[in-house]
Structures are given as structure tokens and as C-alpha cells.
Design a protein with these regions (language model features):
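N-terminal secretory signal peptides
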Residues: 1-24
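Alpha-helical and His/Cys-centered functional microenvironments
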Residues: 13, 17, 32, 179
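N-terminal twin-arginine translocation
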Residues: 22-31, 36-58
């Protein structure tokens, strides 16, 4: 729920204080020995084109199933889930501890770190024009204040490859994983977290910003509130006694007695830290590149009250998971990323399981592509800035079901456009079958399968289907 005026003043003061500290630290970094110095600006021939997409908004001129000129069609990855060998990250530590909540470690993942050129080339081959990917903070800043020029150069090559292929790079600065040292000082719960994130954002933007098409600061920073804001989540390993014991042991391994990471820690404090980090990160990026379009991507469900008396639980969930991000986005976002996979059925006791007999995905939630339309409509009611679908997809080994899911989800986007909702792109999760966190490599979300022994890529029919929609800018029958 929106904060009081006094709370807003305290929050603004906190942001200003964090930004002042960040600016001081940045000057020290740029002047200090052994740190990365600012490079000269790249030549005009290497500058990124302006990707501030101004898609045609006259929905009345669109035929049914048609999409406006300039609409972004793409697929997404995340660094830790595809790159492999992310040894300096918090997640790598947690995956390789014994006991662990992870079904298996990420290991070499999809070896995307070495095969990014091959993977990016798949996008225009299929007909897609956008690649959403993340930078790995733990690679770029493996120790506090020490920025790796080699890793910055690596991501420069990734961005240059996107431009060479005619693909818009949509860059996420943080997709869950953080440097191990950051988690060991308290992660997003630390009072210094937002300053450290702003410093990282500034350094990356100063080095790579002119090659970026558009960016998001954080990926699904509201995920815990989405999952646990109301009772009823089934079959979760998080929040258990084993979970707390693993956090304690991770803190011992760090030698600090502290460890907080993504979904491992005090959920309320983590969420508060992420809200502040988005604001300071946004300001840091805008200071370096005022013209760069900056947003945030939020986890959403299509929330539906299906039993009398569930309205209170609906209000509680939305006020915890969505409203704080709508509030911050009104002043600190140029666009808003909607990430939705299914619906949430709500009753007076909280979240309800899917009805018996309904089709489920391999993640165990309901196969319900229409959820995307519901999430977009709800967001539009509360936020009048451009929307992008930054993630949407389905875990299944039956690719005919993925095609059906895409068709019905994209139809929902088309319905939103017909209602004059400003949706400017659809980014599918995911490009590759990749590491899915606690579930390891079991779930298959990818448009492209990966043999995790040979790293051979195989394009699925669903990838061709989505590419045909993108080529024609029109919904196609599956």
C-alpha cells in the first residue's frame, strides 16, 4: 500500500544518501590504482542504435491478431542459468554445499559463456529481433570494488554481437545471483546494499551503456512476496528448518556469520533492500546515460478470487507483491516488465491448489496461458507507462503444448492491444533449456534444447512457430 508522506520523505532521504555515497565511491574507484578506469567513448560507427521503440499505438487500425510496427519479439536467458562456471556467485556456493536445497549444481550450464555467438545467431535465424540477457555481477566485481576489465570486455562482445546480428539487447543488471562477498555481508538486507548496487550499475553503464538497447535493474525482486504473501503455497523447500540451517552454514563458510541471498534470508528485509536498490540503480544508470530506457521486471500471476470471502486475501497479496513496485515505477521507471506464467486461485484461506483434473505444467502449476492477459490488464489499471512482457513460457517436454501455450498467450497480448493497452514487446522464457534453480535441469522451458554433455543445440518446432509470428507481426495458427 502507498506509504505516508513522512515515510516517503524518509525514503527519498535514504535514496539521496545512498546516491551521494555511491558518487563518492565511484570517484574513488575511477581514481584508484588497480581499478578499471573509464575508457574513451567508442567511435560513432560502434554506437548502439536508439532502441527507444515508439511502436504504432493506434490499435483501431490493427486487424485481429495483428501487432504494431516496432513490436519487440524475443527470447530470454539469465547469466547463471546458461553461462556455466559462475564460481564467484552466492548460488554456486549454495548449490555445492552439503546438504543443499538444489537438486543438482549448475556446473557448466549451457556453456553460453563460450557459445553466446552461436546462441544469439539463432534469434534472427528464427525471425526474432530481441535478446534479453543478464550481466553476472559476480564476474564483473568478484571482490568489493575490484572490477574485471576482462569480464566487462566479454559482455561488450556479447552486445556487439547483438548489434552485428540486428538484435536489440535488453539487458538485466541483476537476475537473482549476486557476488559471494555481497551475500556474506548480508546481501540485500545490508544497509550498504543499495550503494554497492548503484556503484556496480554506474561502472557497467559507463563502460557498456552506449551498446545497450534498453535495461532492467532487477529481475523479479518481488518473487518472495508473490509466493509467500498469502498462505497456501504447496511443496516448497524454502522457509523450512533445513533452509535456515543451510543459511547458517553458508555464513560460517563466508567467515562472517552472515549470508543472505535472493530467497535465502529475511524476506521482508530483502524486499525493502531491493526496492531501494532499484531506485538507486535507476538513478546511477540515468546519471551515466540519461537517454537509456530503464525499467524493472516483476513476477506476476493472474490473481482470481474463486471462493466467496477471498477478496481480503487478494488485497493482501496485491498490496505486498505489486503495489510497492507500481509506486516506485511511477517515478523510477521508463517501462515496466510483466513476467507471468499462470494464475493464482484465491479463497478466504489464501492460495488454492489447481482444480482436480486440470492440465499442469512440469513445474506443477496450472497450464493457463490466459494468465498473461489478466496480468497485463491489471498492471495497466495501476500504471500508465509502456509495458513489455519480459518473461512468459511453459515448462514441458511436449513441444505441441508449448506451441499451444504461446498461441494462447500471444492472443491475450493482441486482445490487450485492441483495448489500447500499451504493450510493446513479448520476450519468451526461455531461449534455451537451462538451469532452473532448485529444480536443476529437469524443467524444460526452452525454445531450443541443449544436450548438457555435448552442448549441441536443437531448435524445437515452438521456436519456429514463435519466429513465424514475429516475421509476420501477426498471430499464426499453431
Amino acid at each position: 500500500m502507498p506509504g505516508s508522506g513522512m515515510e516517503s520523505q524518509r525514503e527519498n532521504h535514504s535514496v539521496e544518501k545512498s546516491l551521494n555515497v555511491w558518487q563518492s565511491q565511484r570517484r574513488q574507484v575511477l581514481q584508484g590504482g588497480g581499478m578499471v578506469a573509464l575508457t574513451s567513448l567508442m567511435s560513432a560507427t560502434a554506437m548502439a542504435q536508439n532502441h527507444t521503440i515508439q511502436a504504432v499505438r493506434n490499435s483501431n487500425s490493427l486487424q485481429q491478431g495483428e501487432f504494431p510496427d516496432g513490436f519487440l519479439w524475443g527470447a530470454a536467458t539469465a547469466g547463471h542459468q546458461v553461462e556455466g562456471g559462475n564460481i564467484n556467485s552466492d548460488s554456486w556456493l549454495l548449490e555445492n554445499m552439503k546438504p543443499t536445497l538444489f537438486d543438482e549444481p549448475s556446473g557448466d550450464a549451457c556453456d553460453h559463456y563460450h557459445r553466446f555467438g552461436e546462441d544469439i545467431a539463432l534469434l534472427p535465424e528464427l525471425g526474432l529481433n530481441t535478446f534479453r540477457f543478464s550481466l553476472e555481477w559476480s564476474r564483473i566485481e568478484p571482490e568489493p570494488g575490484q572490477f574485471s576489465l576482462a569480464e566487462i570486455d566479454h559482455y561488450r562482445r556479447v552486445l556487439q554481437t547483438c548489434h552485428r546480428m540486428g538484435v536489440t539487447p535488453m539487458v538485466t543488471y541483476n537476475h537473482f545471483t549476486t557476488p559471494r562477498w555481497f551475500a556474506g555481508m548480508g546481501g540485500w538486507e545490508s544497509p550498504n546494499a543499495s550503494q554497492l548496487f548503484a556503484r556496480y550499475c554506474a561502472m557497467v553503464t559507463s563502460q557498456l551503456g552506449e551498446l545497450m538497447g534498453m535495461v532492467t535493474t532487477l529481475n523479479e525482486p518481488n518473487l518472495i512476496q508473490l509466493l509467500f504473501g498469502i498462505p497456501g503455497l504447496q511443496q516448497t523447500k524454502l522457509g523450512t528448518i533445513e533452509d535456515q540451517e543451510i543459511i547458517r552454514k553458508a555464513g560460517e563458510r563466508m567467515g562472517t556469520g552472515l549470508f543472505s541471498s535472493w530467497v535465502f534470508g529475511d524476506y521482508e528485509h530483502i524486499h525493502r533492500g531491493l526496492l531501494l536498490a532499484h531506485r538507486t540503480g535507476y538513478e546511477a544508470i540515468k546519471t551515466e546515460r540519461p537517454e537509456l530506457q530503464v525499467g524493472v521486471s516483476i513476477a506476476m500471476e493472474d490473481d482470481q478470487v474463486v471462493e466467496p470471502g477471498g477478496e481480503g486475501m487478494l488485497d493482501k497479496k496485491q498490496s505486498l507483491a505489486y503495489v510497492p513496485w507500481f509506486d516506485v515505477a511511477r517515478r523510477h521507471a521508463d517501462f515496466f516488465g510483466v513476467q507471468c506464467y499462470s494464475r493464482c486461485r484465491i479463497g478466504p484461506s489464501g492460495r488454492l491448489p489447481p482444480e482436480p483434473g486440470v492440465p499442469l505444467t512440469d513445474m506443477g502449476y496450472e497450464f493457463y496461458p490466459e494468465a498473461l492477459e489478466g496480468a497485463l490488464r491489471y498492471t495497466h489499471q495501476h500504471l500508465k507507462i509502456p509495458l513489455y512482457v519480459t518473461e512468459n513460457g511453459v515448462a514441458t517436454t511436449d513441444d505441441t503444448r508449448r506451441i499451444e501455450y504461446i498461441r494462447r498467450a500471444v492472443a491475450g497480448v493482441s486482445h490487450c492491444l485492441a483495448s489500447d493497452i500499451d504493450v510493446r514487446g513479448y520476450i519468451h522464457w526461455s531461449l534455451l533449456d537451462n538451469f532452473e534453480w532448485l529444480d536443476g535441469y529437469r524443467p524444460h522451458f526452452g525454445l531450443v534444447s541443449v544436450d548438457h554433455k555435448t552442448f549441441h543445440r536443437h531448435i524445437k518446432p515452438s521456436a519456429v512457430y514463435l519466429g513465424e509470428i514475429a516475421r509476420h507481426n501477426h498471430l499464426m495458427e499453431g
